[in-house]
């Protein structure tokens, strides 16, 4: 068995932090029937082919085409992913976890891949600056949208296409790779009519669950990250998640602990705090997954219910010890903490002995001779201890190292846990009704035909009296 991601629940138990804020054996017995039910439901849905996302680790059909397309990408100086939300966060997490943070600054002969950029927002300053740094004529664009109609991504594409048409003319289509629905939507039509290379997103896999499809696997391959390693890591986690017992199934345990702390202990906020810069974007990916899947006020049938959901927050160790930790230790005890520990780093950097004056006199003489990894580990342990000492529940997710294989495990672990949590809350983890109205209003504001009533609502909103403005 290759290096496994494990979860340590010691710091969430009542015996560690007290019965008021920790889980007791009685609490665990209280939720155990629900966990058994959820595990059985997931297994049954998988047998009936209704949870396509959990079968993705065994889907390998696209890998040869992905590898071929990745080789062709190396004819470009730059690779830009146009996408937002689930269409971008997974790829960004892969880039950040598996490559040097300064990949784009490395000499061209040492990179082994194009310079990599992710264009998510429609801030005009950002896109304009990106096109100046990465001119379209030197760039391959991966346009990613499950629906094929995402307004932000399509708007970016229209800007980029205009620049490409001006700079490379009839070869503009060669600068695009599309990832979208296999049969429908504007992007699928565009790919078919212009002969643009494309990949399909499985119809049963929603955008925020799509990182183990070509949405994440193609950008990974372009970056020189082996998609097979991501899938193999996910497959190993899949095997571990087939057990119906929460003490053996890490994703079921993760879902159960989060649910129990929210419903039984009033912890409506969950903080993910990795102690590795390379996992910063993974934490952002998790935040979208958890928030958009679980924050609901309807049941799976679409009927109204009391609102539920746990607010995810990203922190980064050791940086946020110097910004957020004060609140976490002395502020309201309404949070569950997930500290992500990495036990082997790719680089070894020793703190050397020094002749700088005052080091020993100022009480810093104990620092030389240690590694930066030792310091980061010491800071992580200190944070755990301070939180536990203030009766804050802390679970620890342990990674042997940050690699494509361990990242594949993490993606699958949290996707499975999110689906299970949705079932515990009795909500549909795959829809997002709360964001649909905003999409309609956005299109109306931009002049979509047939949206005149919505457009009038927007005009009324913008023209409302501002008597409470502070000038």
Predicted feature descriptions by range:
Residues 45-46, 65-77, 130-139, 257-268, ...:
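Glycine-rich phosphate/diphosphate-binding loops that line cofactor/substrate pockets in enzymes
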Residues 1-73, 354-367, 454-471:
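Extended, charge-enriched "interface" segments that sit outside catalytic cores
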Residues 114, 197-204, 309, 364-368, ...:
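Short beta-alpha connecting loops at secondary-structure transitions
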Residues 167-338, 343-346, 434-471:
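Active-site phosphate/pyrophosphate-binding segments
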Residues 71-244, 440, 444:
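Glycine-rich phosphate-binding loops that contact phosphosugars or nucleotide phosphates
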Residues 380-446:
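C-terminal helical cap and adjacent loop that interface with cofactors, partners, or active-site loops
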Residues 96-99, 132-135, 158-160, 192-194, ...:
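Short, solvent-exposed amphipathic alpha-helical segments in soluble enzyme
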Residues 307, 313-403:
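Helicase-primase coupling helices
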């Amino acid at each position: 068995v290759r290096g496994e991601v494990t979860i340590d629940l010691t710091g969430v138990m009542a015996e560690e932090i007290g019965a008021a804020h920790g889980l007791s054996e009685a609490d665990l017995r209280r939720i155990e029937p629900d966990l058994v039910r959820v595990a059985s439901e997931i297994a049954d849905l998988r047998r009936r082919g209704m949870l396509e996302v959990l079968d993705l680790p065994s889907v390998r059909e696209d890998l040869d085409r992905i590898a071929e397309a990745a080789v062709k990408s190396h004819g470009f100086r730059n690779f830009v992913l146009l996408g937002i939300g689930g269409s971008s966060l997974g790829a960004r997490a892969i880039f950040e976890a598996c490559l040097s943070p300064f990949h784009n600054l490395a000499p061209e002969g040492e990179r082994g891949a194009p310079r990599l950029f992710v264009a998510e927002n429609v801030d005009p300053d950002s896109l304009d600056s990106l096109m100046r740094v990465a001119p379209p004529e030197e760039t391959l664009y991966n346009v990613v949208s499950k629906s094929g109609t995402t307004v932000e991504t399509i708007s970016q594409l229209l800007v980029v296409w205009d620049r490409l048409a001006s700079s490379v003319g009839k070869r503009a289509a060669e600068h695009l790779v599309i990832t979208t629905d296999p049969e429908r939507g504007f992007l699928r039509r565009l790919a078919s009519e212009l002969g643009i290379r494309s990949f399909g997103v499985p119809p049963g896999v929603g955008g925020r669950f799509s990182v183990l499809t070509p949405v994440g696997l193609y950008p990974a391959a372009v970056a020189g990250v082996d998609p097979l390693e991501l899938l193999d890591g996910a497959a190993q986690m899949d095997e571990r998640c087939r057990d119906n017992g929460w003490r053996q199934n890490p994703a079921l345990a993760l879902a159960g602990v989060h649910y129990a702390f929210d419903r039984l202990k009033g912890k409506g906020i969950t903080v993910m705090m990795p102690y590795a810069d390379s996992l910063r974007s993974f934490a952002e990916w998790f935040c979208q997954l958890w928030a958009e899947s679980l924050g609901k006020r309807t049941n799976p049938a679409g009927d109204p219910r009391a609102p539920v959901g746990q607010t995810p927050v990203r922190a980064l160790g050791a940086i946020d010890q110097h910004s957020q930790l004060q609140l976490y230790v002395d502020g309201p005890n309404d949070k569950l903490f997930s500290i992500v520990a990495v036990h082997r780093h790719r680089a070894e950097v020793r703190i050397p002995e020094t002749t700088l004056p005052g080091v020993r006199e100022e009480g810093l003489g104990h620092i030389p001779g240690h590694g930066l990894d030792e310091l980061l580990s010491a800071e992580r342990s200190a944070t755990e201890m301070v939180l536990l000492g203030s009766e804050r529940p802390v679970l620890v997710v342990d990674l042997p190292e940050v690699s494509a294989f361990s990242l594949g495990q993490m993606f699958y672990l949290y996707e499975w846990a999110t689906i299970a949590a949705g079932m515990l809350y009795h909500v549909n983890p795959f829809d997002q009704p709360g964001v649909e109205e905003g999409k309609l209003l956005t299109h109306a504001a931009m002049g979509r035909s047939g949206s005149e009533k919505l457009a009038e609502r927007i005009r009324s909103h913008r023209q409302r009296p501002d008597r409470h403005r502070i000038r």
